[in-house]
Structure formats: C-alpha cells, structure tokens
C-alpha cells in the first residue's frame, strides 16, 4: 500500500551519497522526503549520523566506489589511484547491530582471505557469496565495469555458526560450504 511504502521510505531507509546526480536519481525514485544525506560516508560520519539521529543499522547495502583518483587493479594502475572500497565494508561492519546484515557488491579480492578485512569478515557469519568473473562482471554492468572479478556477499553480524552458501557457476546453484 502507499501508506506502507511511505512509512518505509521515511522511517526505515537511510542513504548517504556524495554525488548530487545520484541524489537526484534517488529522489526521483523514492520522492523528496527520502532520508538521504549529501555526505562523504567515510569522512563526514558526524554529519550524516546527526542528520539521521542514528548510528547503528539493522541492514546495510552498498556498491561503494572501488577507487579514487583513477583506476587501480591487475593490468592497470593510474598514478595516485587508491583502492577505497574495503574501507566502506570495514566501517559498515562496525555500524551493524548484532544480528544485522550487510550486503555489498565489490571486487572479490577479499575472498583470497589474506587481508585484514578478510580476517574481520571471517569473524562474522558469511551467509552467501556469488562471484562474477571478469567477462560476466563486464556484462552485468552493461560494459561499464573495469576488468576485474566482482562478487556480492551477505554477512550477518554474529559469530559464524553455519555453512556459507556459495553460488557454483558450473552447476548454476548454491552449495553449502564450510569456510571456517
């Protein structure tokens, strides 16, 4: 119903966006009364937390910028480019309430399990992972993605106690896998 939709948009959704173009798109979709802060998620925390009067979340969804100041990755690294997507994931995990969920779409390099971020993720329940190789990632983003493998993953903010569902591209189905 329209009443329920309005309640969800005005009382349950909070967005932080730095780009005015993207803010305008969100307002076109959700209306002018959407809770959206024109802020830098990482560097203006006090601003958006004050605007929303909230500092913990039940669910966080994101497709953060992967780099700033250019492209960085296998085969290409622009001078001055810095990878930043991991900072968004790391900070979002800190903002989750106990038993809250975090769903992100990022490069899949964390799945090599070598980084501090990967170690932090492994302390949580990884519910689901789906990987996209370079070719499929490129198609998925309508040929606008860089040449890197991507994945989306759902993390529950509690201790790992169950197997993780991993999408098997060969069999086209989710399989249970014990990551820990």
Question: Can you annotate each of these PLM segments?
Answer:
Residues 136-180:
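C-terminal substrate-recognition regions of SAM-dependent nucleic acid methyltransferases
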Residues 1-134, 155-169:
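SAM-dependent methyltransferase catalytic region
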